[in-house]
Structure formats: structure tokens, C-alpha cells
Amino acid sequence: MIEIKKLCKSFGRIKAINNVSLSFRQGEIITLLGPNGAGKSTLMRLLTGFIYPDSGQITILNNNIEENRIEALSNIGYVPENSPLYPDMTVFEYLCFMSKLRNICDSIFEKRCQEIIKNFSLAEVINQKIETLSKGFRHRVAISAALLSEPKILILDEPTEGLDPNQKHELREFIKSYGQKNLVIVSTHIMEEVEALSTRVVLINKGKIIKDTTAHALKMLSPSGNLDEAFRNIIQNRSLL
């Protein structure tokens, strides 16, 4: 679904993404894991077209992102960690607005909206203004809006940030279900999430891919079988790669 070849992106002298090549397929849930400033968010912004690479190529569902930008990006739903919302709108008004931007017809929007309200427990806030909502509810609204067009590729940056334990569980179950027939890419620092969600774990540090593996294989690199310990060992000791 996504092919990345020799991708590079620098900001001044800092190589945020350095010669990255990856391939992602339908039915995968990819976790991007790395320390702060590793390049995870930059890679996500490149995949979603918010910034352009200095060199290299991104192909999404056989569409080169530079040559067929609209076609490529139409298949992606993206939720950054701090999603820009319209605080004066109600939740329903915002979902309507986003559906119009994506040219979703009214009948399909009505069906999708009902599903989303149920899946993300939004019934109690659907007519409230976004500015009155908690951070957790705002994040759920942002994810809901990204799902209106039923994208084949869903990209989530810190998706459970601000959610309570029950909300985290519900969202993780949804991600696992959605990832069975689509591609989901998640950036997170929560090891419990990495273990619960991932079919693949891609470790990034200093703009480079240092390991492409599974959560189980990653755990085995720790004497105690601890995922967080294994991650720290890899970042601190390249001899474990």
C-alpha cells in the first residue's frame, strides 16, 4: 500500500529523515517507536503530504505522492497529536463540515456518522461545542473526522493521549479491528500500546530505521523479556541490532 524509497528530509543541518526505505501492506498495524526527535512525526508528515521530501520517493496505492498528489492522499486519514479543531462548532457541525470538505454525499455521511457516534461514544457530546470538551473527547472527535471517508490508510500520532483507561481500551480494540482490512500506522511512546497493537514495530533514531521487527522479537532482546528495557538497550547500545 505504501512504498518508501531512499527518503531524505533535513531542517537546516539536522537530518530528520536519512535515507529511509520501507514497505507497508494492507492488514498491518505499524508502530513507529523512537525517542523524542527521532524522526517519527517528520515521517508521518511526509506520508501525509504536509511537508515535501528533499529526495526519495513515496508511493501510496500505486500513486506517486509528487506526481499524483490528490489521488495518493485521498486514501489517507491522519490524526496528529494536537489536531486543529474548530472550537465554536458543535461536534456534529464539525463532522458535517469535514464531510463536505471530502465530498461525502449526505446519505453516506448519515450512515458513517451514526457508526462513528456509536464506536466512539460521542452521543452525549454530539451537540456540544468543541471548546467545552475534555482533551480526550476532542481527540476522539479528531479521529472520528478522519474516519468519515473510510480511508484505506489511517495514520495516528499518539492516539490514546488524554484518554482514560476505558477509552484507551475501546480505541485499541477499534484500531485492531480496522487494521485487519486496512493499513494503520501509529506513533506512540506507550510500550503497552506497542505490544497490544503492533503487527510490526519500526524503530527510528536520528532519522534512520534501526530495526524493523515485531513486539515479541523486540522483547526477546531484553534478558527479562521487558519491552521498554529492550527499547532502551537498543537505543543506547547499537551492538544489539
Question: What function would you assign to each model-found segment?
Answer:
Residues 168-180:
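Helical segment within the ABC ATPase nucleotide-binding domain
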Residues 212-213:
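ABC ATPase "signature
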Residues 96, 100, 107-125:
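Conserved ABC ATPase "signature" region
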Residues 56-67, 71-72:
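Conserved ABC transporter NBD signature motif
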